[in-house]
Amino acid sequence: METFLFTSESVNEGHPDKLCDQVSDAILDACLEQDPESKVACETCTKTNMVMVFGEITTKAKVDYEKIVRDTCRGIGFTSADVGLDADHCKVLVNIEQQSPDIAQGVHGHLTKKPEEIGAGDQGHMFGYATDETPELMPLTHVLATQLGAKLTEVRKNKTCPWLRPDGKTQVTVEYKNDNGAMVPIRVHTVLISTQHDEGVTNEQIAQDLKEHVIKPVIPAKYLDENTIFHLNPSGRFVIGGPHGDAGLTGRKIIIDTYGGWGAHGEGAFSGKDPTKVDRSGAYIVRQAAKSVVAAGLARRCIVQVSYAIGVAEPLSVFVDTYKTGTIPDKDILALIKENFDFRPGMIAINLDLLRGGNFRYQKTAAYGHFGRDEADFTWETVKALKPKA
């Protein structure tokens, strides 16, 4: 049997880039909660003892940016300089301006356009992907790497592993076979975890706890064997982490946010962007389309691309490829997608309820992936019934 290896990585919520994603989306939540018509393009950067938010926001909401920054950092676990950042005493810098009136008139006519007329906030192309290799219809490498990161945070916060600190990275290599275009996982080849830790814990304790409390609960036993390789804190020391260890910036973990290197990516990041930004809303609708194709049994694997021009409501193109796993021709699947999904940005926002913020709705997406999540707020994960014409 001919097989191949494929690898996906993830980072958990204490990674400095992910901290920035969460701050940007927490600000988006606050704006949309008070004013669903908010236009938000919020970036965040961080380094030792400093977090800065900057960008363009037009909103009627009254937003305390500094409080949101501190609350978000504190919620992650950055409560002292020792762990990488002190949420209550770090410098918070804010440089927020209003959206360019040139963009505003072209996209939403200064709020005079009907939802179906609202143009894309920028040009670009977005991809959605789905595969039948997991119940989530997501790549196994990505699912496992992401879940390992989430479990690291869980056992840190519930004190199962009190030596853990917020920053951490995971990576999983899976051996696959190609079944006529579909991906079939055979086994987990390698597991890599690098996690920030307290000064006093030994490397032996770290390895033991990671295997028992993180790896075993996450990776199904059927994928592990005596040949599986484990690299657990292979650098030997990871005490300095978070923004103290590395600078962070919104939008630098776009592959982790999506499909772990599978499918394709149109390069636009998600966090800190309201639904008129098709980098986000376009990627959400094509994920729903691709997932619906696979869930309907029309293909075992599917990628969908959509593209836009700034200020234009209708997409420029829609493309589908089922990697030769389709039960009907790709052109017929494309016709079904076009019949069942409205790719106009204003209608995506309505149909996926994307104008609703607050209650951590968008902040939740900013760590542990935007796709494959079984939560009501992830409306784009809801499958549409697709039936080919007789």
From Swiss-Prot:
Please indicate if the UniProt record lists Protease as a keyword: no
UniProt remark on cofactor binding: Binds 2 divalent ions per subunit. The metal ions interact primarily with the substrate. Can utilize magnesium, manganese or cobalt (in vitro). Binds 1 potassium ion per subunit. The potassium ion interacts primarily with the substrate.
Q: Where in the cell is it found?
A: Cytoplasm
Q: Give the matching Gene3D superfamilies.
A: 3.30.300.10
Which GO biological process annotations does it have?
one-carbon metabolic process; S-adenosylmethionine biosynthetic process
Subunit info here reads: Homotetramer.
Q: What is this protein called?
A: S-adenosylmethionine synthase 2
This chain's source organism reads Nicotiana tabacum
